């Protein structure tokens, strides 16, 4: 059985048969990239979300909720309208469309990440790659935006999109969130919700979906203060890293403590390292084995348009290899700067100094005597525009005047003599900055699948069961009368009701032999079966059977809730 056993196929059957998850819209033939969660799957999914939510709250992050549908302006500002695209190629004969980079990789075994549409078209022509569906000729590669487009109301001019990430809902609310945080950096805001990506040809089951759940945190911080105050608590935690250099030289992974990773320059600072450790701890708490987790640094051509550095927490799958489950992206001030520019809103934070500082500032204004006749009524407006410039913009203006002797503002050519330029000293108590952002971004659906895959276990005697982390089991306890006869059934049902009231996810089952029932609950990962047998009416004890060892202990009826809490939750 071991050699022929296909874990993926068995798991797909198990998920459908026992109520974990299955492809959506089955009765209409299904639709790729969409999955429904059944009763058991939805329970595990909620438990994953709960673990992540509780970890975020322990870090002091705030939770919000924002709409899935987002006006187009938001995604123009964020760069998604322009940049959130994948290369696509269409068959000239049958019209089937494929993701071009994936098709080339699957056909030739070469990585074309970062190559242009023209370069991929050339590769397809040179290697005579044909349509996988019909063998027809493929057209030129072009780009396809992955956002689902819609409209707000009955008006075609109010274009909107289903959000491809939850993050933008946080960024556009920054002013209110900063006020809630009392203008004090750093602070973190998260939300857990749906995101949508119109994948070209989603395959691999739950690994690549068009609708999926995310848990994203945006941590706003001062880029000049990147030492995490609690780093000492995690500095000895080990991380398995796969940095860019090792990927390019095929050197494999390295294992370092968080402190070593920072000192050796693999991780940019303790702030970044702290949250990488947080991600690892959450995955472990969900039940992902530590030896199946690594952190891979994305190559520059892989990174999203907003990222200066990204490390992915990847989990190993027997079917799919290393699968990205969580990303930690350094988004710099990209998003807030873009939204400031597009909306005109002030998304800065005032940073107060411990002591006032004397700083040199440029004071630039128009020489009204010189420009008055030239600019006439526009002189006042252009002067106000110059006064509103940042220090950086003023220095750039002066630099250009010094180098070229002139500058054009609103169509007017102005010389150096048209300006009054002074450098003055000022006492300042603080400065306005645009916060930078570090983003831990969790998928929920991939960890769900990988938790099940890594939990699926075959004993030496051929027993197949889910060795899922006990507090992650979709059914925590099964109460089983040995036979369906009084008084065993009444005692069993009363215990079942008691456990329900104590908050356990518990079932009562009296159908089939006790052996079949044990197998039934082993298969779905139920950690403990409580059996009411013929000894129970005599001495008031029951057996608690362990899923993994199949060992049984006898416990008094009144002690069952306490004992189960201890066994399942460690309390």
Curated annotation (Swiss-Prot):
Its domain of life reads: Archaea
Question: Which reaction(s) are listed as its catalytic activity?
Answer: tRNA(Gly) + glycine + ATP = glycyl-tRNA(Gly) + AMP + diphosphate
Major localization listed first in the record, in broad terms? cytoplasm
* Repeat keyword on record: no
Which of UniProt's keywords are assigned here? Aminoacyl-tRNA synthetase, ATP-binding, Cytoplasm, Ligase, Nucleotide-binding, Protein biosynthesis
Subcellular location, record wording: Cytoplasm
Q: Name one GO cellular component term.
A: cytoplasm
Per UniProt, ATP binds at: 197-199, 207-212, 324-325, 443-446
**So what does this one do?**
Catalyzes the attachment of glycine to tRNA(Gly).
- NCBIfam families (alphabetical): glyS_dimeric (TIGR00389), PRK04173.1 (NF003211)
For this entry, the protein name equals Glycine--tRNA ligase
Top-level taxonomy: Archaea, Methanobacteriati, Methanobacteriota, Thermococci, Thermococcales
Give me the gene this protein comes from: glyS
């Amino acid at each position: 059985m071991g050699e022929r056993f296909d874990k993926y196929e068995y798991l797909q059957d198990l998920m459908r048969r026992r109520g974990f998850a299955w492809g959506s819209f089955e009765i209409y033939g299904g639709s790729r990239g969409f999955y429904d969660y059944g009763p058991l799957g939805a329970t595990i999914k909620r438990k994953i979300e709960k673990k992540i939510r509780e970890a975020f709250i322990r870090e002091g992050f705030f939770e919000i909720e924002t709409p899935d549908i987002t006006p187009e302006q938001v995604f123009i500002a964020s760069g998604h309208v322009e940049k959130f695209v994948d290369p696509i190629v269409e068959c000239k004969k049958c019209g089937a469309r494929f993701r071009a980079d994936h098709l080339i990789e699957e056909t030739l075994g070469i990585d074309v990440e970062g190559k242009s549409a023209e370069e991929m078209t050339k590769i397809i022509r040179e290697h005579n790659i044909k349509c996988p569906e019909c063998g027809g000729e493929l057209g030129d590669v072009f780009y396809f935006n992955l956002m689902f487009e819609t409209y707000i109301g009955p008006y075609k001019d109010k274009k909107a999109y289903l959000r491809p990430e939850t993050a933008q809902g946080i960024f556009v609310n920054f002013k209110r969130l900063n006020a809630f945080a009392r203008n004090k950096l750093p602070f973190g805001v998260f939300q857990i919700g749906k995101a949508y990506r119109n994948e070209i040809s989603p395959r691999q089951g739950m690994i690549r979906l068009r609708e999926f759940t995310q848990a994203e945190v945006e941590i706003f911080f001062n880029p000049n203060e990147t030492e995490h105050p609690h780093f000492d608590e995690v500095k000895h935690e080990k991380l398995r890293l796969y940095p860019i250099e090792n990927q390019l030289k095929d050197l494999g992974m390295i294992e370092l403590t968080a402190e070593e990773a920072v000192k050796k320059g693999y991780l940019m600072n303790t702030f970044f390292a702290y949250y990488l450790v947080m991600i690892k701890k959450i995955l472990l708490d969900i039940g992902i084995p530590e030896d199946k987790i690594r952190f891979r640094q994305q190559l520059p051509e892989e990174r999203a348009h907003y990222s200066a550095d990204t490390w992915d927490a990847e989990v190993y799958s027997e079917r799919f290899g290393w699968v990205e489950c969580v990303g930690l992206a350094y988004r710099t001030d990209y998003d807030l700067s873009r939204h400031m520019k597009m909306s005109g809103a002030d998304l800065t934070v005032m940073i107060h100094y411990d002591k006032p500082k004397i700083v040199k500032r440029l004071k630039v204004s128009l020489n009204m005597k010189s420009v008055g006749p030239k600019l006439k009524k526009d002189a006042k407006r252009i002067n106000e525009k110059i006064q509103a410039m940042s220090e950086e913009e003023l220095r750039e203006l002066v630099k250009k005047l010094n180098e070229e002797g002139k500058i054009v503002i609103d169509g007017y050519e102005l010389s150096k003599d048209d300006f009054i330029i002074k450098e003055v000293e000022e006492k300042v108590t603080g400065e306005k900055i645009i916060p930078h952002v570090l983003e831990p971004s969790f998928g929920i659906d991939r960890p769900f699948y990988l938790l099940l895959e890594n939990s699926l276990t075959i004993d030496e005697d051929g027993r197949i069961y889910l060795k899922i982390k006990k507090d992650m089991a979709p059914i925590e306890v099964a109460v089983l009368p040995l036979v369906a006869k009084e008084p065993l059934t009444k005692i069993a049902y009363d215990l079942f009701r008691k456990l329900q009231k104590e908050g356990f996810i518990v079932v009562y089952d009296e159908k089939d032999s006790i052996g079949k029932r044990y197998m039934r609950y082993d298969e779905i990962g139920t950690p403990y079966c409580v059996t009411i047998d013929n000894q129970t009416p005599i001495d008031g004890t029951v057996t608690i059977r362990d899923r993994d060892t199949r060992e049984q202990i006898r416990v008094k009826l009144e002690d069952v809730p306490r004992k189960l809490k201890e066994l399942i939750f460690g309390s």
